[in-house]
């Protein structure tokens, strides 16, 4: 295993160096083509930064990903589908970063990318084994997989509101999945190669994106979410529900934050994906934490979920599950008392009570 760890470290280091260097070029390109994130004072907008910032960071991550693949990847139909799908995601995001496009146009790009993974790559969520029972999805496997990939593609972009937040959360995810793959002896698996290459790529980006950020991921944060979705589906090819459970639990923070954001907006009569300033990180900022400390707190929570995942998968399922429940209750209590059910939102609280009475 020591040899595999050293080999994996080499992949991460080389892609990290390339990513860190390419980000310098991406800043200049972004300025040249006017792909800048300009702060605005519009009500409900989630901008925190005060100055215009280049936003092609995710393009740099994609280029580092390609570089890592050329050095360490192996050609296959699955890998080809991932490259094609990723290119579609990045191309869509570049267009949106230069001149914002409509939501349905972006969604069309995401659907096409997901379709490439499913129909060309053959990566499909076609069954699930849980509690000793096997459930076949049949033709429903196609819409289920499509929905899952599109959801993952957007989840990172939705929580990308602070310097270093998306890059750090994604790095924790890729590191955790890589550790699981190595510990289980899957040294030549596509999951491990993808995780290591993406870990180096996101860490190189994080070097420039951590507060104070000199470059943002831009709409290309969808690329990181897309790869996370693909890796999760590949992991799900394992023998049981645990294969799906691990990557989902590592993403507990963005999943819970996004879920409650959608509920909050629907209860307010807003569009579910409309930007606002009531995400978990906004609540921490409202408690007078600095932007850097807010991100570090979220890192810590995510790392604790990651540790619980590693214990659950590799050591003791009971202890891992207990840790999950404790962490989930803590996060749930915080979110409910700061974002949805809160004295800050008395009208919203009345709406919730009214809906509960009707039901």
Predicted regions located by residue number:
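Extracellular/periplasmic helix-loop-helix junctions in multi-pass membrane proteins
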Residues: 307-325
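Cytosolic, membrane-interface loops and tails of multi-pass inner-membrane proteins
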Residues: 25-54, 260-292, 352, 356-359
């Amino acid at each position: 295993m020591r040899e595999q760890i050293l080999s994996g470290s080499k992949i991460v280091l080389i892609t990290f160096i390339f990513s860190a260097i390419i980000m310098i070029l991406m800043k200049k390109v972004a300025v040249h083509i006017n792909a800048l994130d300009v702060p605005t004072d519009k009500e409900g907008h989630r901008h925190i930064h005060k100055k215009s910032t280049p936003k092609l960071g995710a393009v740099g991550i994609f280029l580092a990903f390609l570089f890592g693949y050329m050095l360490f990847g192996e050609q296959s139909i699955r890998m080809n589908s991932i490259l094609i799908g990723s290119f579609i995601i990045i191309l869509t995001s570049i267009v949106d970063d230069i001149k914002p496009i409509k939501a349905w146009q972006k969604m069309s790009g995401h659907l096409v990318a997901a379709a490439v993974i499913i129909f060309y790559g053959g990566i499909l969520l076609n069954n699930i084994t849980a509690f000793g029972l096997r459930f076949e999805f049949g033709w429903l496997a196609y819409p289920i997989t499509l929905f899952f990939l599109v959801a993952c593609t957007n989840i990172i972009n939705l929580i990308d509101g602070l310097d270093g937040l998306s890059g750090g959360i994604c790095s924790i995810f890729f590191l955790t999945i890589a550790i699981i793959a190595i510990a289980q002896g899957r040294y030549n698996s596509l999951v491990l190669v993808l995780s290591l290459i993406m870990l180096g790529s996101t860490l190189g980006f994080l070097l420039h994106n951590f507060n104070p950020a000199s470059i943002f991921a831009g709409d290309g944060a969808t690329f990181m979410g897309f790869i996370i979705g693909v890796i999760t589906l590949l992991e799900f090819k394992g023998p049981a529900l645990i294969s799906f459970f691990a990557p989902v639990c590592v993403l507990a923070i963005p999943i819970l934050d996004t879920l409650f954001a959608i509920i909050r907006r629907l209860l307010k009569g807003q569009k579910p994906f409309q930007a606002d300033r009531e995400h978990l990180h906004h609540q921490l900022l409202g408690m007078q934490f600095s932007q850097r400390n807010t991100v570090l707190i979220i890192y810590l929570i995510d790392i604790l979920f990651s540790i619980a995942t590693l214990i659950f998968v590799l050591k003791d399922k009971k202890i891992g599950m207990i840790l999950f429940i404790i962490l989930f209750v803590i996060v749930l209590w915080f979110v409910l008392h700061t974002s949805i059910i809160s004295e800050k939102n008395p009208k919203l609280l009345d709406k919730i009570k009214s809906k509960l009475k009707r039901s």
